[in-house]
């Protein structure tokens, strides 16, 4: 009904430019309403968008009700020719740039599910890339390598171990950065 009111004809069954535009406007309008209300009652709004939905969700970061904007640059090891460092770094830089331009905080989610056996160390590479790109809130999806899900990693225990190591590594880098800044005055 809304589509027909806006465009003067029923919504087609195929994904046309009008349908894409309507979808984007609908998503943005919905988030604008709910985040504005949440802001009104004193809540903070943090949103994360998937990279493959950026066309439809790119306007969300600019909403007044959004405080923190994040992305999840999942490189899917073994399934694409994505270098995890390059892929995560470039996407994280774009998110940081967008958030900074809008005066928002940002965060990055690192893939911790559907990791094939033997690719677990790419998680460390991805954490480093996000940190090097300026992210300081870096999280992982999913708990324990997704062991209870159909999208579980092949070696969930190893994924969980590496996620902990990667987190400890960037935490150490963070505190080293603080200490090195303090040492500059001596």
PLM features per residue range, with description:
Residues 73, 80, 102, 106-186:
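Substrate-binding cleft of secreted/luminal carbohydrate-active enzymes
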Residues 1-89, 94:
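Polysaccharide-binding and catalytic clefts of secreted carbohydrate-active enzymes
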Residues 59-65, 93-103, 128-134:
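Acidic (Asp/Glu)-rich catalytic clusters
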């Amino acid at each position: 009904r809304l589509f027909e009111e806006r465009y003067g004809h029923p919504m087609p069954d195929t994904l046309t430019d009008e349908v894409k535009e309507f979808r984007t406007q609908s998503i943005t309008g919905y988030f604008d309403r709910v985040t504005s209300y949440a802001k009104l009652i004193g809540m903070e709004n943090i949103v994360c968008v998937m990279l493959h939905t950026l066309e439809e969700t790119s306007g969300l970061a600019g909403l007044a009700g959004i405080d923190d904007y994040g992305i999840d640059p999942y490189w899917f090891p073994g399934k694409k020719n994505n270098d995890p460092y390059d892929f995560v770094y470039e996407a994280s830089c774009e998110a940081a740039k967008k958030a900074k331009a809008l005066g928002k905080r940002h965060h990055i989610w690192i893939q911790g599910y559907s990791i094939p056996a033997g690719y677990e160390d790419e998680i460390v590479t991805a954490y480093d890339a996000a940190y090097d790109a300026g992210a300081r809130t870096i999280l992982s999806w999913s708990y324990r390598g997704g062991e209870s899900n159909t999208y579980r990693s092949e070696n969930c225990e190893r994924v969980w171990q590496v996620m902990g190591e990667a987190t400890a590594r960037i935490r150490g880098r963070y505190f080293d950065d603080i200490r090195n800044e303090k040492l500059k005055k001596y």
